[in-house]
Each structure stands twice: as structure tokens, then as C-alpha cells.
From Swiss-Prot:
Biological role stated in the UniProt entry: Catalyzes oxygen-dependent 5-hydroxyuridine (ho5U) modification at position 34 in tRNAs.
Record-stated family: Belongs to the TrhO family.
Region Disordered, residue ranges: 310-330
Gene Ontology molecular-function annotations: oxidoreductase activity, acting on paired donors, with incorporation or reduction of molecular oxygen
Compositionally biased region (Basic and acidic residues): 317-330
Gene Ontology terms describing biological process: tRNA modification
EC top class, as a word: oxidoreductase
Protein name: tRNA uridine(34) hydroxylase
Record's keyword terms, sorted: Oxidoreductase, tRNA processing
Length: 330
């Protein structure tokens, strides 16, 4: 089986016609059997997709045919299975939600730092290194000596900056995230708040893992990704984590041995937060997922449509058999 290409991409660029771009972009994804989600907003494009080498190439070629996206930033990795179930293009106010409209990376942001130069920057004792990702992402991997802002969502990051960072005290700040988009917007926020020397890792963690040899790496752990792989290791291969269906938090094999873990229903992160009604709903979904798997289908996405069609056909056939049987007994 040929490997699936997983492509994370983004670009901050003014797209005044972003609403009109949606359907042609979705059509291109479907035509080339590329799955995943792309976000469009006035400020740009962001998302992660997956497909065959030919399919992803066709999508990138389509995007680059628009002069505004000719130099779109993207990172690739590979997986044995399709990590997404559907093809989606969504319209948003922001391609990454900070919640402050006046922050515009198209106007001002920090200085890009190439992966090969990143170690030198973060080894400088005068550099404050800040991980702009969420707490559950940082928990499974981050750079050595990086500060964890302990945020649950990116919207909380401005509050962290206001309470913990001072442009007069913190003269040199380096920031990073998974693919580069959050740290780029974060540096725009920092510049707006008066910080002068602000740097961000070009291409994010994924580009760093791709370009920096393991023996030179300052990365510790695995990198959380927003698809069914859950995390990738330094070789950009699927890591050792799974994901709780209920709360979407990453979990280890050891976590699965805990009494709070019930496959598809709860884990130690959410056991006391999930209602009985939710648990019952999750249990039914898990049951349907197992039945679908036994038939060689996925319970979600395009396979779900095929499964629903098959179930409908089987019900119709059963009704027809019952009708004929009843007729023969008359």
C-alpha cells in the first residue's frame, strides 16, 4: 500500500473573496480524493489535508495558481492510513482564533528563524522561550527549557502575556507552535504590546523535526497533531499516543489501564466531567463503530454514507423477503 501524504499548510494573506473561494476549493479536494479540513478567512488560509502524492500535488498546484497563495507555507509527513474521514472547507472570522480583531500578521509580526538556526537562539541565556500551544499538547512534548503558558485554548494566550511577560524585562522572546501559524499570530500580538525582539520558528515544530537531525535536536517527547495519528515522533511517524473519543485528550497505553478509561466513552481526563447521558451516547457510538469495522467500514465520513446505504438496502431486502413470504402463505 502506498503511503498517504499528510500536508499541513497556512498563509496569512488578505483574501477578500474568501467566501467565493470555498466551493471551487472543496470541489478540487473531492475531485482528487484529498481529505481533511481547510479554513478560509479574510486573513488567509489554514488547515491539514491528506491524500495520495498525486492528489496532494494537484491541490497544491490549484492553490498556487492563485498568485496570493503562490508561496503558501506547507509541511509534509507520511502515514500508512488516511487520518481524516471527510473533505471540508470552512469559512471563519480567523484562520486561528486569538479573538483580537486588530492583530494582523499581514501587517507586522516577529522575525522568522530557520530550523537550522533555532538551537542557537534558544540556547542564548537572554532568550525567553515560550510554547504557544495548549497545555494538553505541551504535556506530550516540547523544547528543552520552554515555558508552558498552561492555556486550554489559544484565546487565553493574550491574558497569559499580559500577566506574565513584560517588554521592559523580557527583551528577547522566541515562540513556537506545531506548524508556525499560532506563533506567527502570537508574535504579531507581542509586537502590538511593545515587545521589540520577537522571534518565531519558521515552519513550526514539524519543520524542525524534518530538518534537524535527532542527535542535534533540542526537542523532547512527541509532537501532538490534529488528526487520527494524535502525535508524531522525531521521524514524523505516528507516535505512541492514542486519543480519548470523549474529550480528545492524548492518552498512553498506561492511561488505558486506569479504571476511569472505557474505550470510546471516558478517560482519566474527563471521567468526572462526562454526564451519564453523554456516556450512554458514546457507548452507542462505540457499538456502531465496532459493527461498522466488522463490515469493513468506518463509522464516520464517506464510509458512514456507504454503510447507511448498505443498511437501507438490507432493510429493503428484508422487507421484500417478508412481503413475498406473507404473500405465499395466503
Amino acid at each position: 500500500m502506498s503511503q498517504i501524504v499528510v500536508c499541513a499548510m497556512y498563509k496569512f494573506v488578505t483574501l477578500e473573496d474568501y467566501e467565493a473561494m470555498r466551493q471551487p476549493l472543496l470541489d478540487t479536494m473531492i475531485k482528487n480524493n484529498v481529505k481533511g479540513t481547510l479554513l478560509l478567512a479574510n486573513e488567509g488560509i489554514n488547515g491539514t489535508v491528506a491524500g495520495s502524492r498525486e492528489g496532494v500535488n494537484a491541490l497544491l498546484a490549484y492553490l498556487k495558481s492563485d498568485s496570493r497563495l503562490a508561496d503558501i507555507d506547507y509541511k509534509e509527513s507520511y502515514h500508512q492510513e488516511m487520518p481524516f474521514y471527510r473533505s471540508k472547507v470552512k469559512l471563519k472570522k480567523e484562520i486561528v482564533t486569538l479573538g483580537i480583531e486588530e492583530i494582523d500578521p499581514n501587517k507586522v509580526c516577529g522575525k522568522y528563524v530557520e530550523p537550522k538556526d533555532w538551537n542557537a537562539l534558544i540556547s542564548d541565556p537572554e532568550t525567553i522561550l515560550v510554547d504557544t500551544r495548549n497545555d494538553y499538547e505541551i504535556e506530550i512534548g516540547t523544547f528543552k527549557n520552554a515555558i508552558n503558558p498552561s492555556t486550554e485554548t489559544f484565546r487565553e494566550f493574550p491574558e497569559y502575556v499580559d500577566k506574565n511577560l513584560d517588554p521592559k524585562k523580557h527583551k528577547k522572546v522566541a515562540m513556537f507552535c506545531t506548524g508556525g501559524i499560532r506563533c506567527e499570530k502570537s508574535t504579531a500580538l507581542m509586537k502590538a504590546k511593545g515587545f521589540d525582539e520577537v522571534y518565531h520558528l519558521k515552519g513550526g515544530i514539524l519543520k524542525y523535526l524534518e530538518e534537524v537531525p535527532k542527535e542535534e535536536s533540542m526537542w523532547e517527547g512527541e509532537c501532538f497533531v490534529f488528526d487520527s495519528r494524535v502525535a508524531v515522533n522525531h521521524d514524523l511517524e505516528k507516535g505512541s499516543y492514542d486519543q480519548c473519543f470523549a474529550c480528545r485528550m492524548p492518552i498512553t497505553e498506561e492511561d488505558k489501564k486506569r479504571p476511569e478509561y472505557v474505550k470510546g466513552i471516558s478517560c482519566h481526563h474527563c471521567y468526572d466531567k462526562v454526564t451519564e447521558e453523554q456516556k450512554a451516547r458514546f457507548a452507542e457510538r462505540e457499538k456502531q463503530s465496532q459493527l461498522a469495522a466488522e463490515r469493513g467500514f468506518s463509522h464516520v465520513g464517506d464510509d458512514a454514507k456507504k454503510l447507511a446505504k448498505l443498511n437501507k438496502q438490507q432493510k429493503q431486502q428484508a422487507k421484500e423477503i417478508a412481503r413475498k413470504k406473507a404473500k405465499s402463505e395466503i
